[in-house]
Amino acid sequence: MRNIGIIINKEKDKENKILNLVILKVKEYLNPDEIKVIDQFYKGDYKDLMSLDLLIVLGGDGTLLGVARKFSTVIDTPILGINIGNLGFLVTAEISELDEALYRIKVGDYKVEERMLLSCTIEGVTCSEERALNDIVVARGTLSRMAQYEVFINDELYATFKGDGVIISTPVGSTAYSFSAGGPLIMPDLQIVSIVPICPHTPNSRPMIIDGNNKVRVKPLINESDVFVTIDGQKALKLEKHNEVLIKKAKEFFRIISFDNKSYFKVLRKKLFKIE
């Protein structure tokens, strides 16, 4: 691999000790022509990143989500996620496993897996099309009253319910907010979407699984409630009356490096169920 990029969460490495260690290890194992250290809030020319053969992300799940949201529309470089955070459910390896991970990449003992992304636009608002690796949440504000929501699938009304909100989740996001709200766990390589009501006041409101090629439209009936759309828990936009949230599968994928010794169920047992 000739050109390698590194993105690090500076809040977790304020003195650059981890960054400097990773740079040394990358040179030792992969001997690249260039190592480009990229700010996680990068605002430069994305063309500078298109030549990367590998992007190493140092942080936790939040850092990876931010990278997916920010960079997925402009580059399709494979990502090696190294956990220097807390949970690290989405990452490829822990920082203690860095040597092994880089060696495996050196000898070609890895695979690149594609993870589904969601695309989100707000009807009636001029804004960019957003991407989400985990979920799109349409929900009331903290101090707002319960709101009513209409959910359409391919322009056909699926459900109307009162509650705190609704989560539209990818398989990757099924272990996040959706899981806490009673949604199902979904194998990450599937191309499906879950629709999960949040604290519904309607007894028959239950999570729904649909094919990823379906389009979802959420119409909050806003009266006295403040309703927001939140992308991966990192970006929030307030909705006004008559705004509708349109959600569909993005044409891009999040490409992440994985190793055969890290099965999905092993990670579930260790990090979600706390079973060694």
UniProtKB/Swiss-Prot annotation:
Cellular-component GO terms for this entry: cytoplasm
Species in which this protein is naturally found: Clostridium perfringens (strain 13 / Type A)
UniProtKB keywords: ATP-binding, Cytoplasm, Kinase, NAD, NADP, Nucleotide-binding, Transferase
BP-aspect Gene Ontology terms: NAD metabolic process; NADP biosynthetic process
Entries under InterPro entries matching the protein: ATP-NAD_kinase_N, ATP-NAD_kinase_PpnK-typ_C, NAD/diacylglycerol_kinase_sf, NADK
Protein name: NAD kinase
Main location group: cytoplasm
HAMAP family named among the record's database cross-references: NAD_kinase (MF_00361)
Binding residue positions for NAD(+): 61-62, 134-135, 145, 162, 164, 172, 175-180, 234
